[in-house]
Amino acid sequence: MWNEFKKFAFKGNVIDLAVGVVIGAAFGKIVSSLVKDIITPLLGMVLGGVDFTGLKITFGKASIMYGKFIQTIFDFLIIAAAIFMFVKVFNKLTSKREEEKEEELPEPTKEEELLGEIRDLLKQQNSSKDRA
């Protein structure tokens, strides 16, 4: 049982997932700080210091904190937009690298061209035999 667990726990996919979760949590903290400490105060200045967190409806001793809910939705939208922009920039950078790699492919040598022609001729011969 222990050996099976070790095989499972140390597979590449599991370790990749663990690293992704840790990095994702750290990135989430960065984005949350961006929203809380930079974007929200700037929007507060633009919107005249609007703060939804204090909005509530009180029924006796119970309070419905709908302002916090609105603020949470607002934070989510900002976080989602920030992550979207990050992923968009990341994808653009990786696609440029892939394009550069494709451009770096060398021209086929004479031997490779001849081997390709032989392959094509063999395919033609095999397809004509199949038809007959």
Swiss-Prot record:
InterPro entries tied to this protein = Mechanosensitive_channel_CS, MS_channel, MSC/AndL, MscL_channel
Any one GO molecular function term: mechanosensitive monoatomic ion channel activity
Give TM segment ranges: 14-34, 38-58, 69-89
One GO location term (cellular component): plasma membrane
Q: Which of UniProt's keywords are assigned here?
A: Cell membrane, Ion channel, Ion transport, Membrane, Transmembrane, Transmembrane helix, Transport
Location(s) in or outside the cell: Cell membrane
Kindly give the Gene3D superfamilies that the UniProt entry links to this protein: Large-conductance mechanosensitive channel, MscL, domain 1
Where does this protein chiefly localize?
A: membrane
Tell whether Transcription regulation is among the UniProt keywords.
Answer: no
Q: What PROSITE patterns does the record tag this protein with?
A: MSCL (PS01327)
Subunit structure and binding partners: Homopentamer.
Q: What is this protein called?
A: Large-conductance mechanosensitive channel
Q: What is the lineage of its organism?
A: Bacteria, Bacillati, Bacillota, Bacilli, Bacillales
